[in-house]
Amino acid sequence: MTILPISAFSDNYIWTFIDKIAGVLDCVDPGEAGPIIRFAQSNQLTLRTILLTHHHYDHIGGVDLLIKQWPSCKVYGPIDERINNVTHPIKQGQSVQVGSLHFHILFNPGHTSTHISYYEPQQGWLFCGDTLFSAGCGRVFDGTIEELHESLLLFKKLPRNTKVFCAHEYTLQNLKFAHTVEPCNSSVINYMQQILKQPSPCTLPSNIDLELSINPFLRTDKEQVKQYALSHGANSSDSLDVFKVLRNQKNSFK
């Protein structure tokens, strides 16, 4: 099985699992139908499964057309009335079988109130929607900042070699903010230089080990990150207080 990011909109990735022997593909968060339909048709593939992480249009906008094209396609997603056409509603603690892949469902509210992620422990793959980005994290919409903080603490506990398949290409801009927070962090500096030199604009997947070294939202226990937060209005150096300031500062960062 092959994993391929299919681009959508300006910076979305629709992660696809391709099994050419079986003649099928599966995808995560198809915000647009066109790219998936064109890819499937050009490779003589049938869409078997759609996995959804949350209700935002750039993640579910293609579902209607895709299930019209492939009526037998299974659609997994969180229990949320804002998402239509989910054939298999799922929640924390359940699992999803997609071909040979066995995904555990992680409840990760914060970005939205019902956000979930798909974790495949045998392969070490995490499809985290808009909860975690490389060197960053999602904004808070209808979830809470406390929930988002807890969701990222959960990700910190995953094995370090876990590959992180984020839904957006935000890495370079996130690294610029990370460098503002930790100007002496050599991991941030080196990784920024690396991706500026690489020929491909795609920086994903990332991995938990890398994120623990470059992502300020996973580094709220580090002294320089604490000092940055305290100098920008944090009430204390407690992890949640630091996280709140980081998220607020990132919201207005240019």
Swiss-Prot record:
Family matches, as Gene3D superfamilies: Ribonuclease Z/Hydroxyacylglutathione hydrolase-like
Reaction(s) the record says it catalyses: an S-(2-hydroxyacyl)glutathione + H2O = a 2-hydroxy carboxylate + glutathione + H(+)
GO BP: methylglyoxal catabolic process to D-lactate via S-lactoyl-glutathione
Positions with a binding annotation for Zn(2+) 1: H54, H56, H111, D130
Keyword Transmembrane annotated: no
InterPro entries listed in its UniProt record: Clx_II_MBL (IPR035680), Glyoxalase_II_hydrolase (IPR050110), HAGH_C (IPR032282), Hydroxyacylglutathione_Hdrlase (IPR017782), Metallo-B-lactamas (IPR001279), RibonucZ/Hydroxyglut_hydro (IPR036866)
Free-text remark on how the cofactor is bound: Binds 2 Zn(2+) ions per subunit.
Keyword field: Hydrolase, Metal-binding, Zinc
Top EC class, one word: hydrolase
Cofactors: Zn(2+)
EC number of the protein: 3.1.2.6
Single annotated GO MF: metal ion binding
UniProt superkingdom: Bacteria
Binding annotation for Zn(2+) 2: D58, H59, D130, H168
Segments traversing the membrane: none
Pathway the protein contributes to: Secondary metabolite metabolism; methylglyoxal degradation; (R)-lactate from methylglyoxal: step 2/2
PANTHER family, per database record: HYDROXYACYLGLUTATHIONE HYDROLASE, HYDROXYACYLGLUTATHIONE HYDROLASE GLOB
Family: Belongs to the metallo-beta-lactamase superfamily. Glyoxalase II family.
Assembly behavior: Monomer.
Functional note: Thiolesterase that catalyzes the hydrolysis of S-D-lactoyl-glutathione to form glutathione and D-lactic acid.
Protein known as: Hydroxyacylglutathione hydrolase
Originating organism: Legionella pneumophila (strain Paris)
Annotated gene: gloB
